[in-house]
């Protein structure tokens, strides 16, 4: 059936900020869908609150709204735009829940707007646990015994009949939020209460646990003529019980018989047909390893994280197809864009193995709860392609960028047998490495299968890797063995370490023996048809399928997996860089390892290499392609760290030179530069050991800011107030800095500002200055930023422009440079210079309308600002005010302290834009989920040094209609100043516990600040207060500057009531 002509304008709902469970995969699917709809001639309107995405670029949709995805704002846009239809299935859980809200409030019926792709009834049937259960019973598809619970009593009733363990799944939530496995009454109470609180409909499913079954996923598509197909099937390495987003996954399935695959395939197609979904859908199934018994776990009636993985694993662009099906096209009318000759109704076939490994944030949150279960904790993921499981698994391990190139971790060899077994039974993020260690110690795969319920087949593959390690040790220098281990994914680094030579010597040995990697194409059809796509992976075989073109090329290094500190912003910059390279007439080649992103969409670049971002893998691509040069500015710290080793191996780095990158990153060289330019900076020195550090800190004077050099996202950064704290930090953090010294600076309390500049070596363009709302001491990635700045004097701006220009020219910068400043007592200090694209580039590009990454790329390729007729100096600001606000994922990460400081903790960002500061702030808070009622109770527990400032804020809260609740110390001070306060006892007191007040919903906002030199009990209590607020979804502020900003919003909305 041809596409529909009765609709013209379509609204696409984006997925909002990146949080755990909903990351860059929705930027990828949303971008694909918008472009596909435009390709078919429809007018596309997009709403998304996340400025760091490609999909919010003006070129992706016809009209782009960066506004909060809330009922009020979306309704306002619907009334203004009057679209014919809405496509909600590409914006993750956010998009689906929004579609339901819009339907339920009646606006869609009123404006006669149709829902495309998946009907409301299907969304309801898949997401509402009770309707889903009824549908499965009608279809005669088995699901685990379960009951819907709206209260703890309901859940206890089910357990009485069915016993423990049970799995609890809240309805309409994302990434398993609020769910878990309960093995006893205590756990049941905690998880059920939490789950009901976090479910938007106050409903959880309690089901008999099938933990230990094999977890299988089918990614299926269907069109309106009822054609349906399986795009990809995937098998979780970890059994049921660990969220699929936290599982290692292989595609295609590895351990099932043909009969089992067929059985699960039939069930998946039966379900998508019964739900009448038009587009993509993900079905999760559990298979009993000892029989052919299976259960349906759940169905996602939308494009998901798994569909991004399936798209990249097969080359079949699911989101693009889903968008075309949504407007009436059928699978037998749409061409498969990879082959260009076959239609989309052919099921992809794979002649390789894909491995996905999640990337967790525990390198930043070393106190976080690392236990894996039904609630997702990973921030991102990597994917690798190989000809066998060993190869794809080891390639994926080295893509993670966690400091290891093999199945080994520091300190594993010294773990006791007892601890080893415990870590294998109770899975954490690093279980894979413990399994390998157990096999090295002689444990049998049968024993490990018994303990973990992981299939023997997978354990045997790890065992094979361990056997090859053993052989490597005993047969040093054996060329035949070298070829075997390379075919099994071993890195040159691992071989070098075992043979006690350097990786470059291993490389030379390989080259002399003709053991060279070849590149194979991802073509959706196992080489059955001719393919058009330039999408490749390496392996050690005979025939190379990647043909080098005669056109000069540029290689761009991507930013790898999404993690805290290095998010989708860097992918945004990478994609823009590629677009500029293509416009300049070069062939653009991307190398990256992240399946969720736009940059790894094969249609973006001229060639895509899906490979780990390590020196060995990049050199392999460089040797084949012989590009004009490599660009490292846009891939975050991942790419910058490769610059020097690449240059040492004769690779040309484009843009700012490696020597100048080093001058910005190396502390001593940077200090020299700052002194030469006569630019003020906080007093600071470097130390390589604890005694040095103590001496320096005493000289400079406490408090000091201490951090390792060469880091991103403030990794292991702290403000230290006492020598004891410093000693403790040196024991913890110097381990972090491997051979790099730590930097110790005088900590300045002041206003923080930030600049992204673009330079061609002669002239400098400063698109804008951003002012942070939070004072120095909160990481810039966790601060709210305002553009244009609201509180800078002309003199301060002039100093910022002067220092920026001097630094750009002194570093002979070609491309982008990010500088952070502190202003204290009217003096402007430089605190940090990053010679690369920073995480503020997308935000600043959107608000200034300067395509910064593209412009920077043109300069990297040799153009000048003058030739491009670009303005220079500080650009004049427009009439609107823009606020960028961070978004956190603390509700997914138990035991991670939500107190903001110099270590970055946010996972995503939103933006609010309006004509006044108050309105822009209001939008930013709304978009980030921080919605405050106009009145209520605010709990204030603040540290002594904050009490004076808190007093003024408390008075303002009273004025707008809030009642103040405080602990005894704060109450005393407030009462003395004449502010009415309700006192609550501290946590350890016996009566009227303040935690009960939070749990019972009596408190609408918690403000909690702690000093670093608090008494241990006070600090502990503060953590419990913050954790309780997060668990119960109560807005929490840990900075008085943010509190001041929220008050500004509340004041602007409250009407004056004053007696005559």
UniProtKB/Swiss-Prot annotation:
Task: Please list the residue ranges annotated as the ATP-grasp domain.
Answer: 133-327, 671-861
Region listing for Carbamoyl phosphate synthetic domain, in residue ranges:
547-929
Q: What is its EC number?
A: 6.3.4.16, 6.3.5.5
- The annotated region (Carboxyphosphate synthetic domain) lies at 1-401
Lineage at the top is:
Bacteria, Bacillati, Bacillota, Bacilli, Lactobacillales
The entry's protein name is: Carbamoyl phosphate synthase large chain
Q: Where, by residue number, does Mn(2+) 1 bind?
A: 284, 298
The positions annotated for binding Mn(2+) 4 are 832, 834
Q: Gene name, please?
A: carB
């Amino acid at each position: 059936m041809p596409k529909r002509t009765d609709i013209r304008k379509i609204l696409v709902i984006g997925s909002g900020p990146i949080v755990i469970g909903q990351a860059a995969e929705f930027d990828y699917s949303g971008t694909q869908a918008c472009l596909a709809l435009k390709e078919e001639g429809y007018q596309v309107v997009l709403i998304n609150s996340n400025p760091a995405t490609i999909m919010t670029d003006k070129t992706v949709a016809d009209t782009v709204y960066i506004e909060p995805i809330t009922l009020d704002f979306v309704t306002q846009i619907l009334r203004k735009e009057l679209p014919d239809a809405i496509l909600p299935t590409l914006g993750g859980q956010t998009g689906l829940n929004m579609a339901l809200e819009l339907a339920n409030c009646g606006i869609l019926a009123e404006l006669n707007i149709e829902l495309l792709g998946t009907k409301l009834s299907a969304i309801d049937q898949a997401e509402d646990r009770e309707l889903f259960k009824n549908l499965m019973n009608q279809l005669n598809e088995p699901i685990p015994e379960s009951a819907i619970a709206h209260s703890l009593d309901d859940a206890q009733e089910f357990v009485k009949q069915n016993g423990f363990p049970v799995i609890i799944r809240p309805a309409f939530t994302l990434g398993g939020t609020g769910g878990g496995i309960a093995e006893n009454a205590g756990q049941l109470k905690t998880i059920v209460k939490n789950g009901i609180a976090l479910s938007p409909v106050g409903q959880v499913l309690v089901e008999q646990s099938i933990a230990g079954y094999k977890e299988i996923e089918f990614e299926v598509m269907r069109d309106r003529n009822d054609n349906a197909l399986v795009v990809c099937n995937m098998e979780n390495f970890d059994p049921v019980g660990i969220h699929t987003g936290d599982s290692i996954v292989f595609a295609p399935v590895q351990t099932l018989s043909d009969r089992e695959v067929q059985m699960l395939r039939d069930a998946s197609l039966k379900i998508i047909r019964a739900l009448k979904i038009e587009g993509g859908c993900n079905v999760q199934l559990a298979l009993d390893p000892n029989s052919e018994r299976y259960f349906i776990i759940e169905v996602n009636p939308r494009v998901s994280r798994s569909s991004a993985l399936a798209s990249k694993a097969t080359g079949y662009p699911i989101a693009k197809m889903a968008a075309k099906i949504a407007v009436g096209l059928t699978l037998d009318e749409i061409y498969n864009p990879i082959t260009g000759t076959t239609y989309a109704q052919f099921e992809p076939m794979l002649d390789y193995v894909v491995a996905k490994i999640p990337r967790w944030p525990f390198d930043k949150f070393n106190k976080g709860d690392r236990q894996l279960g039904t609630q997702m904790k990973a921030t991102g993921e990597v994917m690798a392609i190989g000809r066998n499981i060993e190869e794809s698994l080891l390639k994926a391990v080295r893509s993670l960028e966690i400091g290891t190139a093999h199945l080994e971790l520091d300190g594993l060899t010294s773990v006791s047998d007892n601890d080893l077994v415990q870590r294998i039974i109770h899975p954490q993020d690093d279980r894979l490495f413990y399994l390998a260690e157990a096999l090295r110690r002689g444990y049998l795969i049968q024993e490990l299968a018994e303990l973990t319920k992981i299939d023997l087949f997978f354990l045997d593959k790890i065992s094979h890797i361990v056997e090859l390690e053993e052989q490597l040790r005993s047969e040093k220098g054996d060329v035949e063995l070298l070829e075997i281990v390379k075919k099994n994914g071993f890195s040159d680094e691992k071989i070098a370490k075992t043979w006690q030579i350097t990786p470059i010597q291993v490389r030379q040995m390989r080259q002399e023996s003709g053991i060279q990697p070849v590149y194979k194409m991802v073509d959706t059809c196992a080489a059955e048809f001719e393919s058009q796509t330039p999408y490749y992976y390496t392996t050690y075989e005979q025939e190379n399928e990647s043909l080098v073109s005669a056109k000069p090329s540029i290689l761009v290094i991507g930013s790898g997996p999404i993690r805290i500190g290095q998010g989708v912003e860097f992918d945004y910059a990478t994609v823009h860089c590629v677009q500029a390279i293509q416009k300049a007439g070069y062939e653009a080649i991307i190398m990256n390892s992240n399946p969720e992103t736009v940059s790894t969409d094969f249609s973006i670049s001229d060639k895509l290499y899906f490979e780990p971002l390590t020196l060995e893998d990049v050199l392999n691509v460089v040797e084949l392609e012989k590009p004009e040069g490599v660009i490292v500015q846009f891939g975050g710290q991942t790419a910058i760290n490769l610059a020097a080793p690449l240059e040492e191996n004769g690779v040309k780095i484009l843009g700012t030179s490696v020597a100048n990158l080093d001058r910005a990153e190396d502390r001593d060289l940077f200090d020299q530069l700052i002194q030469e330019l006569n630019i003020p900076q906080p007093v600071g020195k470097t130390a390589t050991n604890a005694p040095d550090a103590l001496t320096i800190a005493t000289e400079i004077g406490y408090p000091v800011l201490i951090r390792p050099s060469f880091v991103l996202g403030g990794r292991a950064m702290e403000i230290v107030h006492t020598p004891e704290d410093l000693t403790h930090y040196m024991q913890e953090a110097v381990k972090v800095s491997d051979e790099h010294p730590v930097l110790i600076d005088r900590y300045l309390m002041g206003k923080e500002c930030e600049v992204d500049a673009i330079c061609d070596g002669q002239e400098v363009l400063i698109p804008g200055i951003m002012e942070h709302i939070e004072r120095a001491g909160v990481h810039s990635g966790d601060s709210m930023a305002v553009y244009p700045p609201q509180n800078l004097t002309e003199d301060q701006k002039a100093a910022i422009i002067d220092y920026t220009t001097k630094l750009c020219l002194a570093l002979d910068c070609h491309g982008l440079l990010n500088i952070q400043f502190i202003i204290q007592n009217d003096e402007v200090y430089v605190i940090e210079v990053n010679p690369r694209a920073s995480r503020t580039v997308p935000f600043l590009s959107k608000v200034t309308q300067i395509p910064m990454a593209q412009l920077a790329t043109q300069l990297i390729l040799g153009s000048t600002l003058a030739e491009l007729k670009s303005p220079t100096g500080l650009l004049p600001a427009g009439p609107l005010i823009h606020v960028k606000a961070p978004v956190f994922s603390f509700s997914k990460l138990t035991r991670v302290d939500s107190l903001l400081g110099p270590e970055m903790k946010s996972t995503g960002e939103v933006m609010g834009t309006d004509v006044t500061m108050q309105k822009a702030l209001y939008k930013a808070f709304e978009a980030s989920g921080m919605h405050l009622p106009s009145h209520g109770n605010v709990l204030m527990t603040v540290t002594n040094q904050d009490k004076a400032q808190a007093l003024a804020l408390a008075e303002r809260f009273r004025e707008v209609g809030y009642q103040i609740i405080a602990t005894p110390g704060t109450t005393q001070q407030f009462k003395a100043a004449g502010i009415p306060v309700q006192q609550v006892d501290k946590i350890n007191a016996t009566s009227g516990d303040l935690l009960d007040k939070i749990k019972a919903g009596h408190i609408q906002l918690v403000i909690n600040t702690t000093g670093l030199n608090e008494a241990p009990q006070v600090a502990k209590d503060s953590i419990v207060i913050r954790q309780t607020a997060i668990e119960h979804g109560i807005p929490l502020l840990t900075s008085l500057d943010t509190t001041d900003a929220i008050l500004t919003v509340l004041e602007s909305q409250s009407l004056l009531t004053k007696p005559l």
